[in-house]
Design a protein with these regions (language model features):
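Short amphipathic alpha-helical interaction patches enriched in hydrophobic/aromatic residues
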Residues: 40, 58-62, 81
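Short acidic, hydrophobic short linear motifs in intrinsically disordered regions
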Residues: 44-61
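Positively charged, polyanion-binding regions of nucleic-acid-associated proteins
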Residues: 25-44, 74-78
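Short amphipathic alpha-helical interaction segments
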Residues: 62-79
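A short, conserved structural fragment
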Residues: 78-88
Length: 97
C-alpha cells in the first residue's frame, strides 16, 4: 500500500531566548529565510523596515500571515547566529559576518 500524500518535511524553529520553537514546513521556512537574508545582504534594517519589506516582497507569493512567519523565522535566524541585532537606537538587524 503506497501513501497518496507525502509527508511534508518540517523544521522546529529555535528562539534566541530559549523559548519553545514552532513547527514550520521546510518550504515556508526556506521562503522566509531566503527573503530575510536577501533583504539584509547589503544593509541593516530596523524591525519595522524588515517586516515592511518582507510583506511587500512576499505579498501574492504567500497566503499566510507574513508578519507571524517573518517574526518566527527572524527569531530562528537570530538563535542560529545567522543574523544579529545591532546596539544602535533603534536596533537594526544585519547578517552576521
Amino acid at each position: 500500500m503506497s501513501k497518496t500524500k507525502m509527508t511534508e518535511e518540517k523544521i522546529l524553529t529555535k528562539h534566541p531566548l530559549g523559548k519553545s520553537g514552532k513547527n514550520l514546513s521546510m518550504q515556508t521556512y526556506d521562503l522566509f529565510k531566503h527573503a530575510i537574508q536577501s533583504l539584509l545582504r547589503d544593509r541593516e534594517l530596523t524591525h519595522n523596515e524588515l517586516m515592511g519589506r518582507l510583506k511587500k516582497n512576499l505579498k501574492g507569493k504567500f497566503s499566510g500571515n507574513i508578519s507571524w512567519y517573518g517574526e518566527t523565522v527572524k527569531l530562528d535566524l537570530e538563535a542560529r547566529k545567522i543574523i544579529e541585532r545591532t546596539n544602535s537606537k533603534p536596533q537594526k538587524y544585519r547578517l552576521k559576518s
